Each structure stands twice: as C-alpha cells, then as structure tokens.
A protein has these predicted regions:
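Non-catalytic interaction-recognition regions
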Residues: 1-93, 110-594
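Secondary-structure boundary elements
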Residues: 91-106
C-alpha cells in the first residue's frame, strides 16, 4: 500500500508533465499553513527559473489540470506560485478503509531486508544499573523495534563490561574475605560448586569496596592486576569464580531490564572479544596498518578533510595490554564472522563521538568490515535533574535505576488512588491499581525520554512526566484507554459494527483525525531512516490531540444514525490500532482502564 503523500505527489506530477513541465517539480508536502490547506506544492517556484516564466502562471497551468479530480476537494493557485491542496473527504475515507484492511496500516515492509546489530545497554557485571544506563536501554530498544517493524533482521546485544580489572578486584576482595574457598586452591582438581559463593547484594558491595582499597593501597592494586592477568590466562579457579559473577549479575540485570520492558537477543560481553584480539593485532601489523609508537601499537585514522586532529587509534598499550578500543574492534571481528551484519548501530553517550570516530575509521581502514557495511554512532545527551545538572540522588550520589522506577511508580499509584477517590469509583482493586501504576510509570519514563531528540540533553521532571495532560506518556495512554472504554460500552449494548466501513468525514474535527491517521506510513519510514524515535512521539501526540478534539465535538454514543455511528466506531478502532502499534515501538503498553 502506497503512502498517501506518494499518491498525491503522483497526481500532481502527472499534471506538471501534462502542462509541459518536468516531473521533478511535482513534489507535494504537508502544508505549513494548515489554516489554508492540507497539502502544498511549491514546484512552480523552482520551475519558473528553468522555464523563464512567472511562477503563478505555471501554478495556474497545473491547477487547471487538477480541477475536478476525485482526489481533491479544492485546488488553489496562490501567488506568487504556490499550489494549495485539500483532499476530498471521500478519497481520504477510501484511503483509511485500505489502511484498516492492511495489517501494517499503510507502512510497507522494506523490499531489501538488512541484518542490523544494535549495541545498547552497556551494563557492567557486578554493578547495579544506574540512571546513566536508562537512555541507552530505552533508545536502543526502540531503535531495535522500529527497525524490525520496517522488516529488517535485527539483533540486540547488551555488550557487557565483564572482563578486565574489575574482575581482578572482585577476586582479590573475595580472597581476603573467604580465603578458604576452593577457587583459590591451585592444587584443587575437582569440580567447582554449582552455587555461587555470594549473592547479588554481596557482589554489589564487594566491587566498590575493592575499588576504594585499590586507590589507597598499591599492594592491593598489584594483587588485583595479577588476579586479572591470571584470569585472562585461564586459571581454573578464577574462571569458575568469573562464571559465577556473570551468572549472578546477568540474572539480576535481566530482572532490571525486564522492568523497563527491554530485552536483548545476545548477552555477549568484552570477554567474548578476547580470543580475537591477538590475531587481529597481528593481522593489522602484517598488513602494514599498525605500527609501534612510544611503545604502543597504533593505527593512524586521521584524514585530510578533518577540521580538528583525530589521534591514532591505540590497539595495544606498551605492556601489551588491551584497551576499550581493542575490545570494540575485536567485537566487530566476531560480529562480522558470526552474523555478517549490513549495519552496526551503537547507542552510546554523545561524549564518546571522537572515540567511535577512531574505532569506525580503524575498522574500515584495516578491512574488519566490508566497504558497504554501515557503522552508525547514535549519540545521546544527558538526563539532567531540575537544576540542569546530571541526575543525582538527594545525597548527591548516582541514583540506581531501580530506585528511579520505584519513585515514579509510587507517584503514579498516588495519582491513580486520588483519581479513584475523586470519582468515587472504587471498583479497581489494590492489585490492579499497582499493576496499572507500573504500566503508566513506565510510559511516563520512556515517553519522557524518547520524546526528546536523542542527541539533546533533557530534564527529568517527575511532575511533568507523570501528568495526564500535555505531551506525556500518561496522556497518550489515557487517550487509548478512553477509546477502549467507548468501544467496550458500544459492544456491551449488544451493538455490532461488522460489515461497516469508515465513511467520508462528517465534520472538520473528524477529517483532521483521518488526516492524522493517514500519515502513519510516511512517519514510520522517516523515523526509521533518521533513527529517530522522537518522531513517533510527535506523531502520536498529534494523533491523540486530533482524536480528543473529535471526541469532544462528536456525540459518538448518542448518534442516532446507526450507519454513521458504526463508521465512528470503525474510525476509533483504527485510531486505537495505530496508537497501540506506536507505543509498542516505543516499548510500553496501555492498561485496560485508568
């Protein structure tokens, strides 16, 4: 099914060609003056230069050929040379009937599906998720869902920080606390226990303690570095301990990500890249890309067109140790080997842009990826508190993500309870109220984040995000629940709309709702192409507003003409379907009632 804009452009282009002008001038866009028209074409302005003719004369020529077409209710040529277009109500209704019959609501699947890996999440094992992890998880999940909806094969990878000094620190601290553990006995040859010798809460306390000690005590740090070295060389007891650290951490991380409705196809980490580092570095040297500089192995990645200096990409330190660059490049190696992706998207803090420029250029220069492989850096801004500074706890520390979710849940539960009392509607059980609060809280957090362009910083304002009015997640959910309520009421009266179709609009507000719905396919294509979930948010806010205007101006349930009422119900069903599809792409759902 073609996008509505494409259909209109095709008709206007045909008129340009019939009038003797090139087809490139027939492009139609949404009107930037909705008070005057719905769509516009400015092609006559550009054609005037080429044909040395007054633009209004060209616009008049084209308008004359469009007059009387079934597609348009009105076609106006406006000086100095604009074409103002309004669709006919019948044509628009026909387009919506097609949309409703199409399970994808007019958003065509790509004809050329790609394999895309989205790298997001970036959690570290043995550490709790904090608010700094929110944006990567929320944006990455939405990018994954959008890309899948367009028809691509998408693989989400959490890319865990599970290798390096933090592991040595934990092993060293465990050895100090529990030296009797069999993992530290090098002579031991038996099977290691299946159960971990620590819980997640112990693990989360061990790491910061060990980290603090290593900063004060040089011998302790040396022991941690030695433990890291032995782990990476494959010492049996340390590998067994490391596996316990991983399984305990991942189980907890999955619980946390589940509460955000975020999931990953791969739970790979830096450790998975480790076996590829030595052969990769060797190949880079052999091919003449990598060379020694001040004892370190580096690859030049600067280009003539650079406005500022791009330093070389370091592959190995002077002591032969690897860095984040090394791990990220080796990760590209195994991803290309195992999954042959056409594109890799990294959802990370925008402050890492220079770093990823180095990594991507190095990967291209050394042939780790094919020339046509896409490498995309989707950098996000900071989530700030009301003071405009990075979000902190009242004590000034970094807030755990779990605590943030709980505080928004509590705020939503309070609002739901107050609403129930105000309405004297005590039908909702405590259990349902809690579940509903959880769903709305998640929408508040995710929509609050995703409605901002990813690269922009934003202020996390709990009062604004949890409001049922304005451009918020709860407002969108309230709109969906309102539609569900009307549909339930209609069906509870024993009425049935089967066989009915969406008719031509009976009012301006109904037409506005229909126009908003018709833009779904074009919006989705644009949001995917620009990797921009905020475009979905803008669209559903506009759609929710259009529906609520229609709802307030139309007596849906008391409409006496049964055919018109059925048409309204069909229109509501389509609105609900499109809104629900969109919020699913953003990563949240609507409750049955609020």
């Amino acid at each position: 099914m073609k996008k509505l804009l494409d259909n209109i452009t095709a008709e206007v282009t045909k008129a340009f060609v019939e009038a003797g002008y090139e087809e490139k001038f027939g492009k139609v866009t949404l009107s930037n003056r909705p008070d005057l028209c719905e769509f516009q074409c400015n092609g006559a302005m550009a054609a005037a230069k080429q044909y040395k003719k007054a633009p209004f004369m060209i616009a008049d020529d084209v308008a004359a050929r469009l007059q009387g077409q079934e597609m348009f209710a009105s076609v106006e040529s406006v000086k100095p040379g604009f074409l103002n277009l309004k669709l006919s109500e019948e044509y628009l209704a026909e387009y919506l009937r097609e949309m409703q019959a199409d399970e994808r609501y007019g958003c065509e699947k790509t004809a050329e599906p790609k394999t895309i890996i989205v790298d997001y999440g970036g959690a570290n094992v043995a550490k709790p998720l904090h608010v700094g992890h929110l944006r990567s998880a929320v944006i990455g999940e939405s990018v994954k869902r959008m890309s899948r909806y367009i028809g691509h094969n998408v693989i989400g990878d959490v890319h865990l920080g599970d290798w390096g000094l933090q592991m040595g620190l934990i092993i060293t601290e465990l050895h100090e606390r529990k030296p009797e553990l069999v993992y530290f006995d090098e002579a031991y040859e038996g099977e290691y226990p299946e159960e971990a010798p620590f819980t997640i809460s112990e693990l989360e306390e061990i790491y910061p303690t060990a980290s603090g000690k290593s900063k004060e005590d040089a011998a302790y740090k040396e022991a941690a570095m030695q433990a890291t070295f032995e782990l990476q060389k494959g010492r049996r007891g340390y590998i067994a301990l490391w596996k316990h650290i991983l399984s305990v951490s991942i189980a907890d991380l999955k619980k946390n990500y589940d509460s955000l409705n975020v999931s990953f196809d791969l739970w790979k980490g830096e450790s998975d890249a480790d076996p590829y580092i030595a052969p990769m570095a060797e190949q880079m040297k052999k091919d003449g890309f990598a060379y020694m500089s001040e004892g370190a192995l580096v690859v030049d990645v600067s280009e003539e067109r650079d406005a500022k200096e791009i330093p070389p990409c370091m592959i190995l330190k002077s002591d032969g140790a690897s860095l984040y660059n090394t791990t990220d490049l080796a990760t590209i190696v195994w991803r290309m080997k195992d999954y042959h992706p056409d594109e890799l998207i990294y959802v990370v803090d925008k402050r890492q842009e220079l770093y990823f420029t180095q990594v991507f250029r190095c990967a291209r220069k050394t042939g780790l990826v094919k020339p046509e492989t896409g490498l995309k850096f989707l950098g996000f801004g900071t989530m700030n508190g009301k003071d405009g500074k990075p979000f902190k706890t009242r004590e000034g520390g970094v807030m755990r993500l779990q605590y943030l979710l709980e505080s928004v849940n509590e705020e939503m539960l309070k609002k739901i309870t107050e609403n129930q009392k105000a309405k004297e509607n005590l039908e909702i059980s405590e259990e349902e109220a809690k579940e509903t609060a959880k769903m709305i809280a998640l929408a508040a957090i995710k929509y609050g984040d995703l409605s901002n362009q990813a690269s922009k910083d934003y202020i996390f304002d709990i009062d604004r995000f949890t409001s049922f009015e304005g451009n918020t997640g709860p407002y969108i959910l309230y709109t969906i629940v309102r539609i569900k309520s009307i549909l339930n009421k209609y069906h509870s009266m024993g009425k049935d709309e089967s066989g009915a179709v969406i008719e031509a609009a009976h009012s301006a507000s109904e037409k506005n709702l229909m126009l908003a719905l018709s833009g779904f396919g074009a919006m989705m294509e644009n949001a995917y192409e620009e990797t921009a979930p905020h475009k979905i948010c803008s669209y559903i806010y506009e759609l929710a507003n259009a529906f609520n205007s229609f709802y307030h101006e139309t007596k849906i349930m008391s409409e006496e003409n049964e055919q018109i009422q059925k048409s309204y119900i069909r229109l509501l069903e389509l609105t609900k379907s499109v809104l629900e599809t969109c919020i699913d792409l953003l990563g949240f759902k609507a409750p049955e009632r609020m």
